[in-house]
């Protein structure tokens, strides 16, 4: 949903080993990336449970950047804190085990809660970053991690959380969100950028 404005800035965001964030603007020679370190911005909780999560992660890490949650290692951090809050033993020891359990209906309901919480926080962060850069051209999610639980992601509170920005909710409602299903997006982008840099000189891959 949303309205595409082809001439406006776009936001690309992707949880993986960390949280990658960049902008894309159109130039006479094609799309140009605006690099940044958005994954290291502060995690801002919105609910009492999220405040509890922040408190536990602060004790562990000191500064809690959003990629402490929105990444593969972040899913592990989130699962660990939810187990602590609920006084439960950790059953799983890797992000892949957690997401697989959530998708397949495993025997630990906290795995499912972890993925749901991940999606909700991801929506909030993506919405904030879309407002920060003015991403009226759309938000593009590129993440092998999210594709591991695609159906859960689509049915999650991501979109609701993305749009829940008070007076700016109407702005977020008009920003389309896309999830790329292609793999190796980093490599594809690298090839495109090489072409983009040299196109004026007549080189082509």
PLM region spans:
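Gly/Ser/Thr-rich beta-alpha loop segments that engage phosphate groups in nucleotides
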Residues: 18-22, 41, 145-146
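ATP-binding/phosphotransfer module of carbohydrate and carboxylate kinases, centering on a glycine-rich
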Residues: 28, 48, 52-205
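Conserved phosphate-binding catalytic cores of ATP/NTP-utilizing and phosphoryl-transfer enzymes
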Residues: 1-10
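Charged, low-complexity surface segments at secondary-structure and domain boundaries
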Residues: 38-44, 63
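Eukaryotic endomembrane system proteins
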Residues: 30-40
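Short beta-strand scaffold segments in enzyme catalytic cores
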Residues: 11-14, 19-25
């Amino acid at each position: 949903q949303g309205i595409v404005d082809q001439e406006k800035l776009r936001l690309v965001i992707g949880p993986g080993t960390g949280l990658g964030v960049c902008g894309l603007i159109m130039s006479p020679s094609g799309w140009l990336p605006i690099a940044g370190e958005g994954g290291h911005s502060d995690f801002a909780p919105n609910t009492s449970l999220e405040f509890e999560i922040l408190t536990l992660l602060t004790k562990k890490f000191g500064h809690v950047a959003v990629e402490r949650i929105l990444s593969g290692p972040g899913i592990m951090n989130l699962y660990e804190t939810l187990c602590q809050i609920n006084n439960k033993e950790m059953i799983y020891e890797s992000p892949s085990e957690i997401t697989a359990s959530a998708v397949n209906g495993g025997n630990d309901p906290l795995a499912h809660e972890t993925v749901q919480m991940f999606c909700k926080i991801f929506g909030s962060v993506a919405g904030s970053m879309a407002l920060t850069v003015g991403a009226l051209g759309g938000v593009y999610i590129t993440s092998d991690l999210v594709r591991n639980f695609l159906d859960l992601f689509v049915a999650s509170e991501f979109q609701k959380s993305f749009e829940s920005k008070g007076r700016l909710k109407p702005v977020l409602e008009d920003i389309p969100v896309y999830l790329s299903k292609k793999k190796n997006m980093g490599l594809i982008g690298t090839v495109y950028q090489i072409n983009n840099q040299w196109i004026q000189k007549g080189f082509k891959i």
